[in-house]
């Protein structure tokens, strides 16, 4: 089979990019030919002679992400239409190109985020808020257009699948394929608190996510921490410039108990160095970091508003009904902190659960879907990089 995957980046250190990276690897393992229509592709994939890269260059001079995404959508569609005879299965990700697709993977549903009671943006709340509101509304319309024109839709969680149905999309063509996780890398890492300057004797929580917006809900975690014993500390990993949370932590008197680490490259070691993972996100499609934490053997505290919470059992975590209830969050954390043995037992159950969510398992499901949709074609020879249509003019 000849597969085309359309996505902005294909690399192992990006959420959506990692998913497509592993899908490409799974397809190559079946001796399929893979064309990647993307702005960036990991060099190790390009070393494979069955990989062709169609680089879609989008200049940073375009005034906003909304415009840049349209440039990508138009350029990719031009190439795909011009080369329609060169592939059997077209796999896209949400709205990303002005073209009908065979497979469409939904990583995030803008319409679901807009309907969430925690959606914070509006036209009358300032220029940035107004832009975010317009961005969401435009993308809601675009994703509905894309899903209606896709033969098969794969959602990364049941929450995402339900939200796509809420857009009026035929549920018969929607299936759930959960993202994978490198279970071995996280389970086999060695703890090293000293490497992150973390206290050796504290009961240590971990929060990973975007620290510049309230959606991930670090604020509620900080409020909960104020009511917990002094030996309960919090490590926070995420991009710090522009974040209000360091000041908020100091204002709450938590300056010595909250450890802001910035961006962390060695996440397996960090996750193996803490006691539990806390992630009461107000809205999440499917969190890779949640899966990684469980693979590292951490019990998790999350909320029903976070996609992926549906897979968490009582044996391996605690799922809250309300992400904005600091008292309930504190009680859940306190339950874990009160018994290290029970905490470790829940972590072991989490690790066992993640053994069934490997990247290979995810990739095999996409390969099976490709087989059902595509028809074998005679292989064609091509080089690694296609420049004709998609290069930005200088």
Segments and roles (model prediction):
Residues 17-22, 203, 207, 212-227:
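A conserved mid-protein helix/loop that constitutes part of the nucleotide-sugar donor-binding site
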Residues 187-199, 342, 379-384:
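A short helix/loop element that forms part of the nucleotide-sugar donor recognition site in Leloir-type
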Residues 208-213, 233-246:
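Glycosyltransferase donor-sugar binding loop
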Residues 263, 282:
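Aromatic "clamp/platform" in nucleotide-sugar-dependent glycosyltransferases that forms part
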């Amino acid at each position: 089979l000849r597969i085309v995957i359309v996505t902005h980046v294909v690399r192992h250190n990006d959420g959506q990019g990692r998913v497509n990276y592993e899908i490409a690897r799974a397809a190559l393992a079946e001796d399929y030919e893979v064309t990647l229509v993307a702005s960036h592709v990991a060099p190790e994939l390009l070393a494979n002679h069955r990989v062709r890269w169609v680089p879609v260059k989008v200049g940073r001079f375009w005034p906003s992400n909304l415009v840049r995404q349209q440039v990508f959508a138009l350029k990719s569609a031009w190439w795909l239409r011009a080369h329609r005879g060169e592939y059997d299965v077209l796999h896209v990700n949400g709205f990303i190109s002005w073209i009908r697709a065979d497979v469409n993977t939904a990583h995030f549903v803008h319409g679901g985020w807009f309907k969430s009671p925690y959606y914070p943006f509006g036209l009358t709340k300032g220029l940035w808020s107004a832009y975010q509101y317009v961005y969401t509304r435009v993308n809601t319309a675009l994703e509905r257009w894309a899903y209606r024109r896709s033969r098969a839709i794969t959602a990364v969680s049941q929450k995402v699948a339900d939200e796509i149905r809420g857009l009026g999309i035929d549920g018969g063509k929607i299936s759930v394929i959960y993202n994978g996780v490198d279970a071995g890398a996280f389970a086999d890492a060695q703890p090293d608190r000293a490497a992150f300057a973390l206290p050796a004797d504290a009961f240590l929580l971990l929060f990973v996510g975007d620290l510049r917006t309230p959606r991930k809900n670090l604020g509620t975690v900080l409020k909960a921490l104020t009511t917990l014993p002094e030996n309960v500390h919090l490590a926070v990993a995420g991009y710090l410039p522009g974040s209000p949370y360091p000041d908020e932590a100091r204002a709450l008197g938590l300056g010595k108990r909250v450890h802001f680490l910035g961006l962390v490259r060695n996440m397996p070691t960090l996750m193996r160095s803490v006691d539990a993972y806390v992630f009461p996100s107000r809205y999440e499609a499917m969190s890779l970091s949640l899966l990684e934490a469980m693979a590292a053997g951490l019990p998790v505290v999350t909320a029903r508003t976070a996609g992926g919470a549906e897979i968490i059992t009582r044996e391996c975590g605690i799922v809250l009904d309300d992400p904005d209830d600091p008292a309930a969050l504190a009680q859940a954390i306190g339950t874990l902190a009160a018994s290290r043995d029970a905490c470790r037992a829940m972590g072991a159950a989490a690790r066992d659960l993640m053994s069934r969510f490997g990247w290979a398992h995810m990739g095999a499901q996409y390969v099976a879907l490709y087989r059902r949709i595509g028809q074998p074609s005679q292989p064609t020879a091509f080089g690694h990089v296609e420049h004709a249509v998609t290069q930005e003019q200088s």
